[in-house]
Amino acid sequence: MQYTEIMIRYGELSTKGKNRKDFINRLASNVQKVLHDFPDLKIQTHHDRMHILLNGTPFEPVNDRLKVVFGIQTYSPVIKTEKSLEAIEKTALELMQATYKAGMTFKVNTRRSDHKFIYDTNQLNQMVADYLYNHMEGLQAEMKHPDMVLLLEIRQDGAYISNQLLHGAGGMPVGTAGKAVMMLSGGIDSPVASYLAMKRGVNIEMVHFFSPPYTSEKALAKAKELTSILAKYSGRINFIEVPFAEIQETIKEKLPEGYLMTVQRRFMLRLADIIREKRHALAIFNGESVGQVASQTLESMSAINDVTTTPVLRPVATMDKTEIIAKAEEIGTFDLSIQPFEDCCTIFAPPRPKTKPKIDKAREYESRLDVDGLIERALAGVKVTPIYPGQSFLDDLDEEDADLL
């Protein structure tokens, strides 16, 4: 049976008071963006619901896109009909006949925002259920845990009937919390942190440090492909490449081994902060988890954060590694994250880094370096690439390699 539209129920938008309209408009824009290649769809927004008119478009391919849009609490494919008992009963029967299977239990659940409608919710539940019993064989009612719930919603403009209540991605529409930069490595943690930042409405741009010839083109392609996976949640993400080899070489040559990691991270944070300012962003996100590695002790974080007053936010800070891995598997980044391409965080990793570095020591060692010159030359090599959902980078690189053989 052909659904006529999709009814979307907002999540936390219902609590946003005077900003509610802006949040709803942003959600509509994000939905429009992910459904841009379905020309027959039409989006209508209301204060408590959004409607996507399908106009003949099948529900399933639209559902595949819609389920990853942040800001949607639940949604249902519905059939809209006129607000009369006869039309409601007829449409309910057609939907049940098309989807009900022998042995399933069901119940009718009615909501009514039009309180002037002649029947109340209990009456509608009973009358529609009786009608179905009289026109179908073998129906079994179950009030607590039915296999199918027939949803009726009586609104001012008509009656909406569905047999599915689907859970959306939740959270806030991407863009409603402003823009930030994300320090993206090629590992497991930072893609999960990116997902969680977007879920809170943050529009993120990826900052990725690479160090050719020490890091390969495949390591860079891997980071871009991780960004492509995450882009399905926002429609597009800008990927910012920052060359980092000269800085790493200089630090390794001139500073004590125990402070290599701390000073490298301080340079990364400086660069991310300058890029943030140039990109008109408000904060810096990363994938650090407290105590997971030497650079992620509170003492290390404090010594690294010393170079900026910009908020540095860590969405996975209190998560166990097993929790982060589970989320990475859920969002589809795990298998790619564990591909063995070394990134710049691992190639110069000292065997015995300081786990409790001192801020004054880090400052003293940096005074031996041409910090401004190193930063300036790294920024001169920055490259920005817009990345879209579904783009492939590793496969394209493999094809280029094959062409050379």
From Swiss-Prot:
GO cellular-component term (any): cytosol
Reactions mediated catalytically: [ThiI sulfur-carrier protein]-S-sulfanyl-L-cysteine + a uridine in tRNA + 2 reduced [2Fe-2S]-[ferredoxin] + ATP + H(+) = [ThiI sulfur-carrier protein]-L-cysteine + a 4-thiouridine in tRNA + 2 oxidized [2Fe-2S]-[ferredoxin] + AMP + diphosphate; [ThiS sulfur-carrier protein]-C-terminal Gly-Gly-AMP + S-sulfanyl-L-cysteinyl-[cysteine desulfurase] + AH2 = [ThiS sulfur-carrier protein]-C-terminal-Gly-aminoethanethioate + L-cysteinyl-[cysteine desulfurase] + A + AMP + 2 H(+)
Listed InterPro entries: Rossmann-like_a/b/a_fold, ThiI_AANH, ThiI_fer, ThiI_N, THUMP_dom, THUMP_ThiI, tRNA_STrfase, tRNA_sulfurtransferase_ThiI
Chief localization: cytoplasm
Residues involved in ATP binding: M183, L184, H208, F209, R265, G287, Q296
Domain THUMP per the UniProt entry, residue ranges: 60-165
EC number from the UniProt entry: 2.8.1.4
Gene3D superfamilies: 3.30.2130.30, HUPs (3.40.50.620)
Pathway where it operates: Cofactor biosynthesis; thiamine diphosphate biosynthesis
PROSITE patterns on file: THUMP
Intracellular or extracellular location(s): Cytoplasm
Pfam families in UniProt: ThiI, ThiI_fer, THUMP
Family to which this protein belongs: Belongs to the ThiI family.
Protein known as: Probable tRNA sulfurtransferase
